[in-house]
Amino acid sequence: DSGGDEAQREQMAQAQYLDLAGKLSAARKEAAQKLGGKVSAAMQSLAMAGGRFEIALTGFEGNAHGLEEIEFLVSAHASLSPKPLAKVASGGELSRISLAIQVITSKVSLVPTLIFDEVDVGIGGGVAEIVGQLLKQLGTERQVLCVTHLPQVAAQGNHHWQVSKSSQGGGVVSSIQVLEPAARIEEVARMLGGVEVTAT
């Protein structure tokens, strides 16, 4: 009878789903531990000493994406327990954690262009240089666009644009200008000193 055949097909499909979903769950658990450890290690050099990154896998009935929900958790300091990333990380921390994840997963990621806005908020000196080097490393395999105010980050770029704002007719107008090699050097030097660059 067709009703019995249909029930049997449904049972077979359910068994196949559970088998594949179980394999996916095992792979996710292993990948979550590895990625969590690597991102936590990267956070130490990105001005988040003592910070931890974890991936929580919470089981539920299942859907087309598997048998668990996935949530990124972070703690900015060793004394804090990890909380949902979106609720506890500042904009700059989010950007740096995203940068760490992108660098770590770059070999398997298919994203052709990455955009980082204010990845350097709240950092300077050596940490800024590390961020710049990580961005440059990412840029060897894909296009990376980064808005930055730090010369240590800007100096790592292959191409530079300068964004400026001016008052016009009672409003503010933003403009963007491509910087040629000499202008790039001058702009990075200006960022270092904060003043107009002169010949002396």
Task: Map each language-model feature to its residues.
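Extended, charged alpha-helical coiled-coil/arm scaffolds that mediate oligomerization and mechanical coupling
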Residues: 1-46, 50
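Long, charged, glycine-rich C-terminal linkers/tails
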Residues: 44-68
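GG-anchored amphipathic helix commonly corresponding to the ABC/SMC/Rad50 NBD signature/C-loop
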Residues: 72, 76-79, 92-114
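Short pre-catalytic strand/loop immediately N-terminal to key active-site residues, enriched for Gly-Thr
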Residues: 82-89
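Conserved D-loop-proximal element of ABC-family nucleotide-binding domains
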Residues: 108-109, 121-129
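Walker B catalytic acidic pair
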Residues: 117-118
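C-terminal lobe/lid and adjacent interdomain/linker elements of RecA-like ASCE P-loop ATPase modules
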Residues: 126-200
